[in-house]
Amino acid sequence: MNDLTKFTNQIAKPETFDQIQIGLASPERIRSWSFGEIKKPETINYRTFKPERDGLFCARIFGPVKDYECLCGKYKRMKYKGVVCEKCGVEVTVTKVRRERMGHIELAAPVAHIWFLKSLPSRIGLLLDMQLKQLERILYFESYVVIEPGLTPLEKYQLLTEDELLDAQDEYGEDAFSAGIGAEAVKHMLMNLDLVQEKEDLLQELATTKSELKPKKIIKRLKVVESFIDSGNRPEWMILDVVPVIPPELRPLVPLDGGRFATSDLNDLYRRVINRNNRLKRLIELRAPDIIVRNEKRMLQEAVDALFDNGRRGRVITGANKRPLKSLSDMLKGKQGRFRQNLLGKRVDYSGRSVIVTGPELKLHQCGLPKKMALELFKPFIYARLDAKGLSMTLKQAKKWVEKERKEVWDILDEVIREHPVMLNRAPTLHRLGIQAFEPVLIEGKAIQLHPLVCSAFNADFDGDQMAVHVPLSLEAQLEARVLMMSTNNILSPANGKPIIVPSQDMVLGIYYLSMDRAGEPGEGMMLADMAEVHQALEAKAVTLHSKIVARVPQTDEDGNQYLKRFETTPGRMLIGECLPKSHKVPFEIVNRLLTKKEIGDVIDQVYRHTGQKDTVLFADAIMALGFRHAFKAGISFGKDDMIIPDSKDALVAETKELVADYEQQYQDGLITQQEKYNKVIDAWSRCGDQVANAMMEELKSSPIDPETGRQKPINAIYMMSHSGARGSPAQMKQLAGMRGLMAKPSGEIIETPIISNFKEGLTVLEYFNSTHGARKGLADTALKTANSGYLTRRLVDVSQDCVVIEEDCGTERALEMRAIVQGGSTIASLGERILGRTLAEDLIEAKSGEVIAQKGELLDEAAIAKIEAAGVQSARIRSPLVCEATQGVCGKCYGRDLARGTPVNIGEAVGVIAAQSIGEPGTQLTMRTFHIGGAAQVNEQSHLEAISDGTVQYRDIPTITDKRGRRLSLARNGEIVVIDTEGRERAIHRVPYGTHLLHENGAIISQGDRLAEWDPFTTPVITEKPGIVRYQDLVDGKTLTEQTDEATGMSSRVVTENRAAGRGKKEDLRPRLTLLDENSGEAARYMMAPGTTLSVEDGQQVEAGDILARASREAAKTRDITGGLPRVAELFEARKPKDNSIIAKIAGRIEFVRDYKAKRKIAIIPEEGEPVEYLVPKSRVIDVQEGDYVKKGDNLISGSPDPHDILEVMGVEALAEYLVAEIQEVYRLQGVKINDKHIEVIVRQMLQKVEITNGGDTTLLPGEQVDLEEMLETNGKLEEGQQPAEGKPVLLGITKASLQTRSFISAASFQETTRVLTQAAVEGKKDSLIGLKENVIVGRLIPAGTGAGMNRMRVAASSRDAALRASYRKLQESLIAPATAAEEHAAELAQGPEAAIGDDPLATVEGETHGTDADAGDYLIEGDEA
């Protein structure tokens, strides 16, 4: 019976294996897979369409073409199953075997496998320690190689040309040494390798080597050698003797009409291999001349190369139509390859798509499904229901009824659809809210109706968007759709925890209109008793929606009782108040104000937090209906006269024009440079544009009292739309009624002449032309942006996909310090915002009273945050995914709150993917451009600081000096001025440049608006710290010093220049500097002068402390492009080194200038104790420190954007995380996108998974190699007591690199560089234990996240239970063999516990960890044993 059910060798179910291993196939293995050798290149007979025998489609090898029928037709039907026909040799079985049976080709000469030869680094090359060039010369028959030199002076593996070989044979005799050519020679060389010996030699060499670069190469070779030893692969398997042939159904040949065939490219490639192989066999049999055989062998090698990876070496082999043939590698690679096309994304049944239209009368959980569509999608359910009701006898009849659409069918469709959710999806699905479940409502027509509130989640609009419908079939799928994916369960956005179901556009406008109050409306000051009176008064027109009235509004107290409370309000706001849920947590106050889109979002947020999901959904639906209704009733519209151009515009423009003319004159007079003029002009115009815009806004905002009626004039409609957040923005209004402002050239620079007109006035021809650049660039950008953003998301998902919450608490002691982000003068993100929804790592104690505000391990919710903010806490230590010590994934405590639910995160939540989606989804809103900032445009704004609040001022790390005028000057390079308000909170942190004039004492009390500091924005001074006499050193006129006279003012100044001696002779080593002599003529201080510095003192001048010796121009340091938008985010996540990166001090110590080279100078930091650290700095860069300065660890020696790798090395993981989070948030903040920090932290955690071994200890790990942190810990765990563990330092990998280095090779191969990943994995014999999400999708399992994680746990438990049962059955059988006596049985009954009597299954509580074996079952059988 068993044989009957097992038709064919059935494919293993995806649940039945735990790991997938990849390795090299030995020739024996390939032959064992094969069902026969393919000897002929023929495919099928073009007349009979029957496969040729021994050809590529041979039925004898691969199986029958028709089910249960041999080729010649002698045996037909099931009864001959398994018979092999003696005439045609075909086994009678199902055709499906043609999809799984393989064949092989026996090669007449071995060939090298191109993956192991050409995929960098070449594995064969590394093993033999030869260059790829040399290997290719051997393999493609260009030169001989010495395999065994014997006693001759030839080197082992030395290459010889034909002539050299003949000479050598003449000289030493033919048998004195062995040489070979082609793949055979390489195969010999690989077979003769003694890997274990090789490993020992390499380790020896590694220990003794002295050079810098050698160890890297040795480690590379060592890893390959070790991987061959560990994996059990043999090196000679990289050379093929047999080529496997994949099953014919996987490379089909289909006859087209007209006698032609469509075929898979693989067949062509195989045919070439077979043809050349057969020809080579014949040539060898005929004993053809060597040169001909050799040529044929080379061609065979090329044919096999093309089959495996076409185009990897030499020309691409093309088919008849000049199209490159798709080789086996191409089948896997890229978007169209097997991984991404068929395994990660499949097309599914039971789906349809149609245009969407708005469905404002739907409830939030519903969508309108066209009847026709529903009928088609739910067909099987309808058939089943028809059958169950006994309406149709047969399936055929049911089909007929459905096709005819009889009225019974529609009734049944209604029944089937009730409570059966469907999933709607809109492409592009950028985050998980792009697929949501709804209950279908049948509608006429052909378009899907979508609820307006979910549009923002789908990013849908109704201008012709289409959406797809999917039907969840199984009960579990329906359950998940209803419980997890229903639109009512997705009120909050997973990216930032704010509601995503927020009214937009018309609804916002309607609600804004309702909540306005206006002076002088009819009925102002009326007292109304309750809601009913308000409605009556509105009907009677006694009041308008905007009249200011006093009314009693029903409120709910904490016990749920209603009471009335008086409010000054308007009837419109009371209408909104009616929609609010009845709860004391959401009082009427929260809607008793002017509601813009942002405020409505806050109201929905509060309703959700305090009253729960159901009420929120009802409230959202109610407020939507209200908004639409009143937007319609208000009849808001605007005409061109609503765009009011401010009267002050002309005056402002004229004033700016004068300024610009003035700058032009200054430039002509030589007072300012071209660059400075440009910056000032741009500045002036942008200021003018802003002033015009402000004037316009003021004018639009004002709604004066109409003298005739005494009522306020209606407010400007355009202003209403913009201010409420319904549509339009101040920037757009500025273009309509202000001035268009400055435009950019295609190169990105800003054109100096602005567009003065606005769209209402109309542009001049020149202005119109200037504005076309920007417009066109915008369109081109948009197209690029989508692709770039999508790619960023894909890389992020790939790096973080296996990050899942796997346990409640990992118990780590580490934590991140969080404080408010203060930039310049304002708080960008308060402490509360940053720690909301996180877990505290230690008790928060109020400084003044010492009481504990929040406990360690508490999840901070809104209430706790309010307490913390009130107490004025400065910083808090919180848990973060970055410090989590869970081995795979993260733990719930470190992650904190699940943002989309507002509850602690569940185990199994795929937080990695959510993080990737949250960062990638707003990617399309970011800009693509790099901002070009011309020098002073940013700098000259700021030449002083003002206090933003009352309080005290504190200087951190600012040494000061007082000059002879009594001014305090800062000598700090990295000092900070901190403003602390009266409650002791840090309100602002400012970094000020060197030489700043500080106006207050440290700790002085200041009031708001006081000046704190001023500085010269254009130059950096060199200040002397001691009195003395100045001497010029190496400042030679004409070489390193020039006199420059300013034509405009006639003043001359001395400028240090770079010494470019004309003579080709020995260049003098001139290091221009000033030295300061003290009273004993000893050298007191040295100041190096960078080129471009203007000297302010004479040689021999007496100076006091605090005097300025020289000024270096700051212009040069500032003109660097600021990369913004998407490219910046990608740059940070890829951990790229910035172009002009800053140099960070690795240790604390004093600075010393060591010496100058041609283009660089060497500076060193001398610590108090220990070795000095040296840096090479290009001369073109301005060095921020002077000789003798004391620097702290992590200070900038040279300004620029820091290199994240440096930050990690010098400052550690926490500082790096802080930097990356701050920089990435900065980019998103500019676009007004909110993303929670923890998402970025999850990604950064994934980038920090690897460590570089610094000390191998007693392990097999080598210093300098990169391994997973887990791997290092595992290796250390295997050590004996007293052995030294390996140590390592964390390394930062960019997201692409990190994804390619995941432990799962399946996941890495499906990401990028497929061949390289698979080659590497095969050599190492990697096992993929299917831990991440992607691998499981690829092998077709449930992912180990969400409900899948639970299923996995259950499966493990079930299998261990099965094992226990099996063992108990065995016990039972054993007891049957020797029957027990009555007395023994009686004793056994008494010995049994009371559980046995209750009938509780003692095995029901089994929870195992592994797939059970009988051995595991031991513990559960104790009760049975006692018997």
UniProtKB/Swiss-Prot annotation:
It holds the Pfam family RNA_pol_Rpb1_3. It catalyses: RNA(n) + a ribonucleoside 5'-triphosphate = RNA(n+1) + diphosphate. One of its GO terms (cellular component) is DNA-directed RNA polymerase complex. Binds 1 Mg(2+) ion per subunit. Binds 2 Zn(2+) ions per subunit. SUPFAM superfamilies: beta and beta-prime subunits of DNA dependent RNA-polymerase (SSF64484). Zn(2+) 2 binds at residues 810, 884, 891, 894. Its EC number is 2.7.7.6. Keywords: DNA-directed RNA polymerase, Magnesium, Metal-binding, Nucleotidyltransferase, Transcription, Transferase, Zinc. Zn(2+) 1 binds at residues 70, 72, 85, 88. It is an enzyme of class 2 (transferase). CDD domains: RNAP_beta'_C, RNAP_beta'_N. Belongs to the RNA polymerase beta' chain family. DNA-dependent RNA polymerase catalyzes the transcription of DNA into RNA using the four ribonucleoside triphosphates as substrates. This is DNA-directed RNA polymerase subunit beta'. The lineage of its organism: Bacteria, Pseudomonadati, Pseudomonadota, Alphaproteobacteria, Sphingomonadales. The gene is rpoC.
